[in-house]
Structure formats: structure tokens, C-alpha cells
UniProtKB/Swiss-Prot annotation:
Span list, region Disordered: 12-43, 593-612
Subcellular location: Membrane
Cellular-component GO terms for this entry: cytoplasm; membrane; nucleus
Gene source species: Saccharomyces cerevisiae (strain ATCC 204508 / S288c)
Sorted UniProt keywords: Membrane, Transmembrane, Transmembrane helix
Annotated Basic residues bias: 31-42
Other facts: Present with 105 molecules/cell in log phase SD medium.
Top-rank taxon, per record: Eukaryota
Protein name as catalogued: Uncharacterized protein YIL092W
Biased segments, Polar residues type: 13-29
Amino acid sequence: MVQMRSKNMAYESGTNNYSDTIANGNTLPPRSKKGHSGRRKRSETLPIACNNFCVTRQIDDDEQAFKMLDKVSHLKKFSAEDGDDNNIFVQWADDITDILFGLCCTGTFLKLLISSALSGRAKTWFDSTTEGIDDHVIKAYSFEKFLALLSEEFDGARSLRREIFTELLTLSIDSEKSLEAFAHKSGRLTPYYLSSGAALDLFLTKLEPQLQKQLENCAFPMTLNLALLITACEFAKRASNHKKYRYKNTRDSDICTPKSKNTAIVSKLSNTKTISKNKVIEKSDKKNYFDKNSQHIPDPKRRKQNEPGMRLFLVMDEEKNILTSRNVSANAYTSKNGHTNLSDLHTNLKNSKSQQCAVEPISILNSGSLVTGTINIDLINDEVLGTKEETTTYDERMDGNSRSLNERCCAVKKNSLQPITSNIFQKNAEIQGTKIGSVLDSGISNSFSSTEYMFPPTSSATVSNPVKKNEISKSSQVKDIAQFNPFMTNEKEKKLNPSESFKSPGVSMEINRLSRIAGLRNIPGNIYEDSKMLNLKTRKCYPLHNFAVRTRSAHFNDRPSNYISPHETINATLRSPASFDSIQCITRSKRVDAETNKATGSAKSENIETKSRKFPEVINPFLVNTTNKKESD
């Protein structure tokens, strides 16, 4: 029974160990021997099992390698940085040992697994260290050997502390900042890597001899912290003394050199004075003078270049060539053909090296019409010019290709503004009469024509007897002023012919002189056109009172009879300028009674008054007294 039973067990086991027993027919050993032999077999089969794992499963090495890499990648990596200490390294070593336990692999693959579990400085050092090992030698490196290599280098962040120690050796202590750096780095090394005494000796070697003697002679037992404190106090004392020395030097330099400072202030003041003087001169030059051979082009924004216009040129002679300017002004009017010749004037001005500048046009109308320009009288005033120089002004009309139509020139001499007699001007007017008539008949009659100014110099040959000239101007002064003043004309008065303004130069000049005194512009000749100045003819005149002061507490009925409320004036689009207050009326309009100083009522104003009194039931509480007076009347 025992034999049959042993045979069945051996057959069921199917092992090669019992095959010999079955074949030879031998019996099994006793029970005690069985247990002993079984233990021996297990001890003997462990390396065999390991060998079978490594050898028989070589086909599955790639799959196992990927699994190992995945496990290591999820592991917390060791970097050996400043915050990593010995405990962190031990924890990392235990974790990677658990992952790689039972793996029968060596060499390059194991090196790759360990490198994937490192980062930072630890990974850099491990890769650089194992890179130089031969492939045949690295096959003998097991996991324990790689781990010992890492522990030797990174146990307690040994390499990091070594780097800090090298920095301490090269550090020089010469300021408070370097002293703080030494204290910080030595504090990281003293407990584990560097002793307190060694750190103190290293610190003393870096100080100056004076500080070394001061620390050696100290009465207290010297430690690293005490040495750092004494050195910091010494550096702070030196810094304060240096600041005081610099401040003292600056004060001494300021006290010793007061003259240079004052001279600098004086030079600044002189520079500011010269700059202010130059600015004043520049402003006056902009008004009166211009550089030689320089032409001031008018602003294109203020006039259209494509439309015909008139330019006013101001030619100034800085070199005071009086004879040259007089000859030029005389030749401008005494041409061979009897016309004003601008080309000769241009050539003469260029030969005399005079100065030209274009003044912007004063007014520009629609295209195809005449353009007027009036000479600014401020250029002749003594306060504006400030110097006694002769100027030659001429105006030029640009009308397409032809420049000869309506060309007028005038020569002006300062302090010699005298009107020309009518007989001399009539000669010029007769020559230009045909051209002016043709222009007026051609449909340009509703445009403005500027009043001509002619101021010849005293030495000119065209000047006639001044006594006769003054008589003519005085005789025609009052009559022509009443005709030319638009604020004193009546509707029934006849319109003036525009050509008549060319036949009375003295009168036109006197009118413009009076308007200049009043602060007005020069009055054009054809200002009486219905389409332009309709409201100026119908405006009523009244004494120039200050109604705001006079009627502040008065009733409406106490105001002057010729006072017109702004609500009663219809179609009064033009407002009288403030300069009208200085005008003294020479003649009165027919609408104002000279004796009673009251304006005659018109149908239009009566209708307006009746319309304004239609609603008696509406009572204004502020006008109770006024309404009572009206009811009593």
C-alpha cells in the first residue's frame, strides 16, 4: 500500500526528481528525510527559479520595461536642491527600491530607470558621472551599486554644501552686503558640513588686519555670531563717516567758490535778457521787416489758388535807398503807354535789392468776380513801424493768363500822406475808363471795387500845387461824405455810379481817413447794391445814449421815442459795430425830425405796435405801473 501510494504521488507530481525512483523501482525515503530533503530542494530551487524568470521570459522584457518606466515616472523625483535634506533622499531611495525589487536587470537599462527618477542637479550629476563608464563595465553595476553611488554624493545634500563652501572660500568681505552673504551661507553649512570654529577661522582670514586685531583683543569670548555683529557695526560707522565727509566737502566747495556761482546766475540773467530782447525784435521784424532775398508765401488755407485773386506786396528798403525807391515809384506811373506797368516795377525793385513779401489777401469773393484789397493803415502809423523808412506797396490782380486788367500801384512815403489833385488823377482815370466800363458792363458790376490810394513822394514830379490841392479836397469833403457814408443815406437818394469813385481821389481818401479814425474799414465804392447792403439803408438812427444806465429803473414809456426794441426790428441781420459810438453824425436822415429829435413813424412799425398790444387780459406783475399808465391814457 505504501509503495502504490508513493507511486501515485510520484506520477501525479510529474517531476524529474522522482522519475529516477520510478524507473529504478526504489522506495521513497523516510518521512524525516522527506522534510529535510524538501527544505534543501527549496533552497536549491530559488536561484533556479530566478534564472528561469530571467531566461525564460526574455520575450516579455519590452513589456516589463514599459511597466517599470511608467511606475518610475509617477515616483516623486529627487533633485538635491537647497530644500532637500538627508531624510528626503532616504525616502526616495526606499520608494525606488520597492518599485525595482525582484527585477533581474543590470547595466544601461537600470541606469535609464534611475535617471528618470531624478531631476535638477541630481540628474545632471548622475548623467555626467555614468556617461564615462564603459558599456562592458556598466553591465556589472547593480541597483545597490547605483544607489550607493548616489548616497555617497547626495547624502544630506553633500554636493550642494560643497558648492556653498567653495563660494565661501572665494567670497571677499568688504561691505555690509558681502557680510550678509557670508552670514547666510555659513548658516547653511555650520550644523552639518562646517563647524562653528572652522567658520570663525575662515571669517577672520577674510577681514582686514585692523579688524582682525580688534576682534582678537575683544574681552568677550569670540564666536561667529559675535564677530559678525562687531564687523557689521564697524562697517556702518565707516559708511556714516564717509557721508559726513562728502557733505562737508560739498559745503566747503560751495563756500570757497561763491564767485563762480554768482557769475553763473549773472550769465543766466543776461541770457534771459538777451533772449527777451531778441523775442521783441523778432516780433517787430515779423510785422515790419523781412530778410533779404526771402519771399513770404501767403497761406494756401486762406485763399484758393485756382481762383483769380489779388495779392498785396509790401516792398521794404532796409538799406534806405531813398533815391532808388523814389525813382521806382515815379517810373511805375510814368510809363510810355500811360498805363501802370508792373513788369518795370518788378525789374526796378529787383535791381535795387529791395525786399518783397506777400501779404495775405483781405477778402476774396466768388470765382469770376473782382477781388478787393485795402491797405492796412497801421503799417503807416508811427507806433507800428517805429522807424522812418520808405515803403513801396503795390497790388497785383491775378486773373487767369492776363495780368494787365485792373492793375493799380501806389507809392507810399511815410509822413508825406498828401492827396493828389483831381486833374492829375483824371488823366489816369480817362486812360483806364474804357477798361473799367467794359468790366462793369460785362456782369461784374455787383462786385466790390476798392478805393484807389495814391501817395506820391514829395520830390515826385507829379505833385502839383499843395494849396490848390487842399482847397479842392476841403470843398468836396462834406458833400462827398454824405454821399459815401451808408449810415446816413436815404432810400430815395440816387445810387452812385462806381466809375465816379475814380474821378474824386481826394474825397475818397478823406472818407477813408475819417473811417480809419472811427475804427472802420475802408468803404468800397459800390456798397449801395441792393443784394449786399439792404439793411444798412433802412436802419434808424437815434442819439447815442447808454440806455442800460438811463432806463434801468425807468418805465418803458420814459424811454426816447426813437428807441427801437430788438423784438420790433424785423430783418435786421446786420448789427452795428461798437465803433459806431465814436462817429459824430454830420447829416441826419429824413426819418428823424431835427427839432424834436424824434423819428417819424412808419406803417410797418405801427402795425408791429398794434400787434404787440392785442392781449390786454395778460398782466405782467413786473409791469403793473406801466399797464396802469396805459389804461389811464
